[in-house]
Design a protein with these regions (language model features):
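N-terminal compositionally biased, intrinsically disordered segments and leader/signal-like regions
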Residues: 4-5, 225
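Hydrophobic, aromatic-enriched alpha-helical segments typical of multi-pass transmembrane helices
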Residues: 2, 8-218
Length: 226
């Protein structure tokens, strides 16, 4: 018989962490959608990445959007770690979410800028932010799926989260290899592919995990045997 211990934590903090896990993707999405609506004439949702919003004179708004998401994702990662049964190397999934949050901070600290022709460009280091966020968020889902599989309370989400993580890694490769670089075959639809990665793959998985954490936070911690 295998005994799996569930970390005893403050349910109040876990509830707040779960709210942060839902609010992060939702507020971030609302933030860039509103900015896109304002910049309707000189911004393309299909071609331009979300980070191109930083190149605008009002780019500080998107920088703040990145930072707020980073804070909420970090809080969520901490609460999530405390809400899943402890396993060997189980810390890796939440830690990868934390690294993804660092990628968001880098995106704010090293924003895209506009050249004289009005085109956004990376003056340096912003590409590291994108690589960090998209790779680590996808890897986090894959690793978390393994930890979920070891916890009966989370097992029902394991397959979905694992598939989302694998799809996220595939999207990361497509974006980095075939869409984001100038002259790449899918460069003209890079913005669309980036948004699909977030809104169809990564964000729904994060919200599903956060909602499960919120539900479990209302239950008393216990020792689960399987």
């Amino acid at each position: 018989m295998i005994t799996t211990s569930v970390r005893v934590s403050r349910p109040g903090f876990q509830r707040w962490a779960a709210r942060a896990g839902v609010a992060g993707p939702v507020l971030f999405t609302a933030g860039f959608l509103v900015q896109e609506a304002v910049r309707r004439e000189d911004y393309s949702r299909v071609a331009d990445p979300i980070s191109a919003l930083e190149a605008d004179p009002r780019g500080w708004i998107q920088q703040v959007n990145f930072l707020v998401f980073a804070v909420l994702l970090t809080i969520f990662a901490i609460g999530l770690h405390r809400g899943i049964a402890t396993t060997r190397y189980g810390w890796a999934g939440p830690a990868l979410l934390g690294v993804a949050a660092v990628g968001l901070i880098l995106a704010a600290v090293f924003p895209l800028r506009e050249d004289p022709a009005g085109e956004p460009y990376d003056p340096g280091h912003h590409v590291i932010a994108g690589v960090t966020f998209f790779s680590c968020s996808a890897l986090a889902l894959v690793v978390l799926s393994c930890r979920f599989a070891a916890d009966p309370r989370w097992r029902g989400l394991a397959r979905y989260v694992g598939i989302a993580g694998i799809l996220g890694l595939g999207c990361f490769v497509v974006l980095g290899r075939f869409a984001m670089p100038g002259g790449a075959p899918l460069h003209e639809v890079a913005g669309l592919l980036q948004r699909m990665t977030l809104l169809v793959v990564t964000f729904p998985a994060l919200v599903a995990i956060a909602l499960r954490l919120r539900r479990l936070a209302c239950r008393p911690s216990a020792l689960t045997r399987s």
